């Protein structure tokens, strides 16, 4: 209870931070008594404060959900003592990533939440989770090595890792050099964001984890990669040399991801593919390189964080209520669990882009920005975005048809369920539905936390005007380099970096 209350208070504090950053400008903190660019600078501008606020909503809802579910069922096999502190460590890493004003501390933030994610992914130590965890660790280590290599290239080229000052000095380098370094960052962040062709690891690892773990991973971890790409694109590599490449990546990410989704029988795996697909929309906005495109990307990220997390929490409810997340084993949920059906249908339609939900509004913002760009590649992306939205809706309605509307007796394996609900420790043994323990027993807190997140995601529809206004201002301030650089460097862009003795004098 104390942890949930603390997480709830964080939501309020970060709402205040958005107001402060929006009305009073960028907020900076110089850590350890050293000013930028030598010291560690924490930066809260409109973009980072928006991401912090949305992440706090997700972290609060998932913690509430986790504490409410089988964590209090008295099961000694559930590693509760490991989950909660590791979850807090992951939260710290995500927050540090959003606030970092230099590339090295961005790297540190990534490493902190990745270490926590290794533990969370393999909780319960089932063979399937350990196998998926090994692959996840290997991919994450490769991403971290590429990130560190890119960071070293920046320092070797411009003598600083402070993003504001690095952006100034990058302008003096040849275009080819800047493009090569930025391409290295795209690979590093692309692995974390799961963009094509660096996405194959995600659908193989996320579905194996517990639902609460998958929910927070899907909602936040990939978006940290997207945020990092926005940040370095808008502050360090401002020339737009690789925008056309990013457009192609965005198109392929959308199409390949959604094609994978419509072929799935497991709901978790299907959701994992839709997660990959919709990262493509955010890359679309970044690649346009305009204020309208970036605003659309930020708006869509806010929408997607809340909607995708709520969908994974609903899958957890389905698993506990019906004993499976396999479509070939599901049916009749609309009649046996109407509340779960409603909690699924609203975010599913939202993700599919049905008007007037925020998913539709975010896509319209991106399509309008693409039309303003006017290039043939932008028009191809617009077509890809529309097709992806339609196929996403098809995939979501396929789950609705088979899992909620169909009679369970008509399902190919409708009588096969998990022997008991899986909380954190994986339990993969199956029994006939009549022999299952705890049939349909879902704690109220799991419903309430999921409903809270569904309500939060739906509220974007009604608050679309104010939210799009602040994302517009966030995009404008991100594109106006003088504002960010002045706030971080304290109007001293020529401050020394390598010669610390001269700096001390």
Predicted feature locations:
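C-terminal TM-helix exit segments that contain a strictly Trp-centered aromatic cap at the helix terminus
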Residues: 13-22, 148-155, 351-355, 460, ...
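Cytoplasmic/organellar membrane-interface segments at the starts of transmembrane helices
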Residues: 327, 334-339, 396-505
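Single conserved hydrophobic/aromatic residue that forms the stacking wall/gate
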Residues: 2-8, 12
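Peri-membrane helix termini and adjoining interfacial loops of integral membrane proteins
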Residues: 22-34, 157-166, 321-322, 364, ...
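Short phosphate-coordinating micro-motif centered on Lys-Gly-acidic
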Residues: 111
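Interfacial/capping segments of alpha-helical transmembrane domains
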Residues: 16-33, 466-482
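Hydrophobic transmembrane alpha-helices and their helix-loop junctions in integral membrane proteins
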Residues: 61-74, 87, 91-104, 117-364, ...
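Hydrophobic alpha-helical transmembrane segments in multi-pass integral membrane proteins
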Residues: 25-94
